[in-house]
Amino acid sequence: MESKKNSYYKNVMDKIYAKEKDVLSINKDFQENNLTRISLILNYKDFYLKFDESLHGYSFGYVTNLFGLKLYSPFTETVRFDDTEKYMKTILGVPSNEALPQLCSDQHQNFEEKDPQIEILPSPQQQQQQQQQQQQQQQQQQQQQQQQQQQQQQQQQQQQLTPPPSPPLLPIPQPPAQNEEQQLTQPPSIPPPQQKQIKIQKSDRGTQVKSITNPVNSLSKYINNSSLDYSIKKNYTLEEIYENNKNYMDKTNNFLHFLFTFIDKTTIKDLEHFEKEISRVHNIEKLINEQNVKGETPLHSLILYNSESCLKKLVIAKINCMGIFDYSKCDNLNKNLLTHAIEKGDFEIIKLVLIGGCPLKMSPRSKLFKQNFKLYRQQIYRVFEIKEFLTELGFNQFIPMFLEYEFKNINIYYQIKSFIMVLTLNADEILRWKSLLEPNKNLDLDSFCIEYQIKDQNGSESQLMADHFKKVCQLNSLFGYIDFHTQIGSAGNASVFEGTYKGMPIACKEMPVSGTYEQRVDSIKEIAAVGQIEDLGGCTVVKTVGVLKYNEKLFLVMVKEKCNLLSFLSNKSEILKMQRGGIWTSIFKISKEILKGLISLREVGMYHRDFKTANFLVSNTGKILISDFGTSRDENEKRFNTFAKTIGTLWYRCPRLGDCSGDEKTLNHYNEKSEIYSLGIILWELICIAMTGTYVSPKIALFQNEVDFSIWIHKDYRFSFPIGTPQSLVKLITSMCLPCRDRRPTVHQILDEVGIIETEFLSNRGIKGEQTYSGLECWREFNFSKQNVFGISISNLHDTEYKAVNKYNYTSYNNKNSLLMKRYLDNSNFVVELINPNGIFKFKSFFEKEKLLYLKLKSTYKGEYYFDMGKFLTTIIQIHQITEIYYKMLQKYRELGLLRNNNNNINNNNNNNNNCNNSKKFKTTSESTSALGSDASSSSSPSSSSPSPKYSASIYHHQ
C-alpha cells in the first residue's frame, strides 16, 4: 500500500517538477523575483513529500505551508507567491482553484484504486466549465461597472441643476451585487490609510492570498477588521488564521491552543469547513497532545475557555473519531478533561469525553484534608452529586470505576450509616463500603520476611522481633493518601512525605524495602523498634500510626508534628517567643524533656544511637518527642556489640576511642554512656541559644572541609561557651563530653543536676560565679602533659595528604586576597608552633607550580598517621578563631599579671627568633603579630625551645 502511494505521488511530482523547471527557465517574471521554486506539499498522515532544490544554483532553507503552497525567497521571509494563478495556469494548464484540490485531496483512502500512471489533470470538460464560469464573472463585472458609470453621470447632472448656495448632496455608492451569504457574513470594512488591498480568491481548500509587502500594515488590518469568526466565514485556512492572529497567543502554545481558545466565535455554518481543515492538519496528532506551561492540551483550552457551542462539540467528536488524543493527560493541577467538563457542567461534553476514553478520576484534593470536618462532609456530598450526575447521563457502568478511584484517593472518613443514607447505595455497594471499614491487621514477621525475601534471624532475636511486630498494625490503604509532591523532610536515606489517613495529617517515611538486603533488614528492625516503644504511649516519643502499603511501596506512618527541634531553634521568631517568656525557663524545660525521653527508652531496653536536634520533634502542644528510630537497636541484639561505622551523625557522635580501659570489646561496645555525649552536644546548642540569641551549630568547618568535632576530643577538653554561661552548666556539659565514657554521669544524675541548677538559677535570677571568656577557661584546663597524650590512628590516611583546599584558583582573586590568605596561614603556623614546641605535629602551607594550596598534616608513627591529641587543637576550631583566642589570652594574662617578661627577655627572644632554624616558618610572624607588641614575640621563642608544662597558661610563663 505505501509503496503504491509513494510511487504514485513520485510520478506526479516528477511531472510537475519537469514542467515547472521548463517554465521557470523561460519566464522572466519568475526570474526577476529571485524565487527558488515552489514547495508543493501533500499533507497526509503516512507520508510527507517536498522539494527544496534551487533552479538558480542557490541552496535556501524554507518554511513549508502545512496546508498548501508556500515560498521562501533568499531576500525575504516566508511570503505568499505573487502570481499563484498565473503559475498554476502556465505549468498545470488549469486555474489554481481546481489544480490544488486534485493534488491535495482529503480522501486519501481511495489512493489504492487509482492508476499511478494516470496524470491527475483536469479534463477538457472541466476546463470548458471553468472558462464559462470566468466569462460569466467577467460579464457580471462589466454590468456592475456600467451601472456605476450611469450613477456617476446622474450625480453630475443633479449637481449642475442644484442652486449654488446649498451644498450638493452626494449619494452613497451602492456596493456591487453579492451573494446573500456574503452579505450576511461580511462585516463592514474600514479601509485603513496607506494600505494595499489584498485580493482573496476563493477555492474549495480555502483562499490564496497575495504577497504581503508590508506585514505590519496587513496584520493591523486583520486585527482591526477581522476576527477568528470573520476568518472562518471568509474560508481562511487554520494556519492563515493563526498567522493573522498569532500576536494574541503565548509562545508556549501551538496554534491549536489558540484556535481552540477562541473557537466559540464561529457559527454553525462553518462546521463543515472547520471539520475539513482539522482533517488537513499534517501533524495534528502531535499538536493535539502538546502541553503548554500550565500543562494544558488544546482540548483543555477548548473546554476551559469556551461556553457552550456546537463547534466545540464537533471538534471533540472529530478527535474521538480520529483516535489521536491521549485522554490520560492532566494539567499541572492534575485535572483531566473530565474534571474540567464536570466543573463546567456541560452534559454533552462529558458524554463525548467519556466516550473518548477519559478515565473517571478527580484531582487529588489534599488541601481539603488539612481542613476541618465540614469540608470533608462537603466532599461526601460532592461524591453523591457525581454519582447522580453519571446516573442521569446513563453511564451507570462507570460508577463502580469512579467509586473505586475515589475510595483510594479521597480518603472518605464518615460513618457507614451516613454514607448509606446520603449515597443511597444498593446491597453490593454496601458490601464494598463495609470492606473499607475492616479492622487493621497486625503485622506478621514471617510473612513479612517471605514477602521481602529476608532470611530468618537468629532464634532469640527472631522471637523478640516477632513480639514487637505484633504491636504494629498494617493500615487500610483505601483510607490513606500520600502527597509525593510535598516532601517535608528526610531521615537518613529515606524521604518523608506529607499525607492523610482518615482525615488526620500524617508524616510518611518511605522504607527502603526494594533496596539492598541490608536496607531491607534495617527496615525490619526499625519496624520492630516501633513496636518496642508502643508501650510508651507517645508521651516521650512520636506516635506511630502503623505501616501503610501505598502504590507498591511501604511507609511508616507517624502523626505529623509541628517541626523538628533543629528548625525550631533556627527560627528567629520562635527564639523571640522564648525570650519574651523567659528563655532560660524554655531551655531547662526542653533539656528535661529530652532527658526524660532517653530514660523512657532505657526502660524498654533500647538505644537510639542517633541523638541530634533534627531527630527531636516539637509537637503542636510544645512537647519534645523523640523520632527516627532507623538506627535504634535492642540492647540484647548480638549484632549490636560491634560499633557500626555509620552510627549517629558526625557532629553528635561519641568519640570512637578513648583512654577508658584496655579491653577492646569494652572500648567498642555502645552503651548508655555513649548517648550521654550526644546529649551534651545538644545541651551545648541550647546554652548558646540562651546566651547569644542565635543558633550555633556544632559543625565546624576548616575552609571547605568538615572536621569531626568529636574525634579529636582530649582528656579534660572543653569547647568554648558564650560569655556569661553559668559555671554549673559548664561543668555539667564538660563532664558529659569527656572522652572516657566511664567518667561520664548517668542520665538520672544529669536529670537531677539539671533540676538543681534550674532551682538555683531561677531563684537567684542571675549567674553565680566567675564569668567565663570564650575559649579562655578551656585553654587553662587543657592538659599538655605527655603521660596523658596518646596516639590515635586515622583510618585510610596511610601516606596521603590531607587537602583542606582542593584547588585554589588564584585567577579569581587579586593579589591582595592572596597575600591575606598567605598571612592567614602563617598565623596558623605560628599558633601551632606555640602549642607544639617539640614539632610532633606540623601544620604547613606551601605553593606549588600548579598553584594548588594544600594543608599538610605530617606526623608519622609506625607507618601510619598518628596525631598528638593535645597538639591537634587546630583542627577543632577554625584557625583564625584560635589566633584570636590566643591574642585574648595574652591580653588577659597581662592584665592578671601572669606574664613575667621584661624588655631584656623581649630583646633576647627576638634575637633567638632571628637565629632560629625554622626562620622561614616565622617569616611573616612579626607582620601578623605586630598588633600585640612585644608580648607576641616574647611568647613564641620560649615555647618553641622548652617542654610544655601542665597547663596552657604555662606556655607563656614557663620560667
UniProtKB/Swiss-Prot annotation:
Cellular component terms (Gene Ontology): cytoplasm
Superkingdom in the source lineage: Eukaryota
Annotated EC: 2.7.11.1
Binding site for ATP: I488, G489, S490, A491, G492, N493, A494, S495, V496, K509
GO BP annotations, alphabetical order: signal transduction
Pro residues bias spans: 162-176
Reactions catalysed according to its record: L-seryl-[protein] + ATP = O-phospho-L-seryl-[protein] + ADP + H(+); L-threonyl-[protein] + ATP = O-phospho-L-threonyl-[protein] + ADP + H(+)
PROSITE patterns cross-referenced by the UniProt entry: PROTEIN_KINASE_DOM, PROTEIN_KINASE_ST
Any GO MF annotation of the entry: ATP binding
Keyword entries, A-Z: ANK repeat, ATP-binding, Kinase, Nucleotide-binding, Repeat, Serine/threonine-protein kinase, Transferase
Chain intervals for the UniProt region annotation (Disordered): 154-213, 904-959
Top-level enzyme category: transferase
Record-annotated Protein kinase domain positions: 482-762
ANK repeat extents: 294-324, 333-362
Family classification: Belongs to the protein kinase superfamily. Ser/Thr protein kinase family.
Protein name: Probable serine/threonine-protein kinase DDB_G0291664
Organism: Dictyostelium discoideum
